[in-house]
Amino acid sequence: MSRLTILLVVLVMATFSSPLRSQERKLEPVDEATRDLSWAHFKNRLLDAVMKRDRKFVLGILDRNVRIGVDGVRGVDEFRKQWHLDADDSPLWRDLPSALFLGAAYMKREGRPRELCAPYLLAQWPRSMDPHAYGAIIAKDALVKAAPSSDSPTLATLSYDIVPVADWEVADKAPDFPQKWTRVKLKTGEGYVPEEQIRSPIEQVACFVKTESGWRMTAFAPAGG
């Protein structure tokens, strides 16, 4: 075997055994209920209700034991109270659409019926990746900046990558600019992506079940409750 051949073999083995390479994971977007016309109709109706601040509709589609948090808090009254649903600036009006727009995936957990959960990240998350330490880029060609500013140099471009997160919310360098950034770890150091282009799998997750009377929301909670 020639020296050149040996060198090539060593390089190939190093490439595939590199810890950095083994850490590269992607989470492509999915929407597993696209062929279910009843879901498409329901989701559009729910988004329309949220846009119009239609509290009656939102409360009407809640399961009576709807999950609100990971601490076991449940019920329609608690949902209304914890989400400040009677306020025009309820965070629900912002957070629920951001979850639904990303697509949904089915998941089955012990003691619960099969649920359709949005966004898809929690249901599709690799078990080998710590959901508390990583986030998933939810955009194609997201620019990673050297500093929390759109004017700073671009370090990399990411598309649906799972990346380690150092800080979930960093203010823009411009004091009065509302853009928030997330500090992520790269092979070569750290960089910043707009916070709307990355998401944690344990952020607010909305889960639904299909019943004889239609779709019901069973949870809107961190990690789906």
Where are these regions (language model features)?
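N-terminal signal peptide c-region/cleavage motif recognized by signal peptidases
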Residues: 17-18
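Short, low-complexity N-terminal intrinsically disordered segments enriched in polar/charged residues
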Residues: 22-48, 60
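SH3/SH3-like beta-barrel superfamily modules
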Residues: 157-197
